């Protein structure tokens, strides 16, 4: 399998992990427990959070599409830097989750797994850059 194909697959696995991270946060709702983190009164109150989430989910989707159709050296350089950025963001998120009390260890385990996937994505993206 080519590094390009591995890159696409790793981005897809990463996105599935992100979705599961969100799903784990909402799972208590199905057991009658509250997951309320703020006392927002309307969608307008949480609009910035929604935009931030969209801004975090969409770039990997665009990267998957671009990687599927682009093989230029300049794109590969950009893509490698992009994977590094996401690894740094994942590491920061993992550290932030460790600061929340109580620590939700199943989320920490998932975030550590996502960080490992990100590191693998960095490595494969670097291989693709050098190919």
Locate each region found by the language model.
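Cytosolic juxtamembrane helix and N-cap/initiation of the first transmembrane helix
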Residues: 1-18
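Juxtamembrane helix-loop boundaries in multi-pass membrane proteins
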Residues: 7, 11, 40-55, 76-83, ...
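Hydrophobic transmembrane helix segments
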Residues: 14-57
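Canonical alpha-helical transmembrane segments
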Residues: 55-72
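Hydrophobic alpha-helical membrane segments
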Residues: 58, 76-95, 114-117
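Membrane-helix interface "capping/anchor" motifs
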Residues: 67-77, 130-131
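Membrane-helix boundary connector in multi-pass membrane proteins
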Residues: 88-108, 129-130
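Membrane-water interface at the C-terminal end of transmembrane alpha helices
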Residues: 115-131
């Amino acid at each position: 399998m080519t590094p390009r194909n591995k890159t696409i697959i790793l981005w897809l696995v990463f996105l599935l992990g992100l979705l599961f991270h969100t799903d784990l946060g909402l799972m208590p709702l199905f057991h009658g427990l509250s997951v309320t983190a703020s006392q927002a009164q309307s969608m307008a109150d949480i609009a910035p959070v929604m935009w931030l989430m969209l801004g975090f989910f969409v770039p990997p989707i665009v990267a998957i599409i671009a990687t599927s159709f682009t093989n230029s050296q300049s794109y590969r350089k950009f893509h490698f830097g992009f994977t590094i950025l996401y690894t740094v963001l994942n590491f920061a998120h993992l550290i932030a989750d460790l600061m929340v009390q109580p620590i939700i260890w199943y989320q920490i385990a998932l975030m550590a797994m996502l960080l490992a996937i990100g590191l693998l994505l960095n490595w494969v993206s670097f291989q693709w850059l050098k190919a």
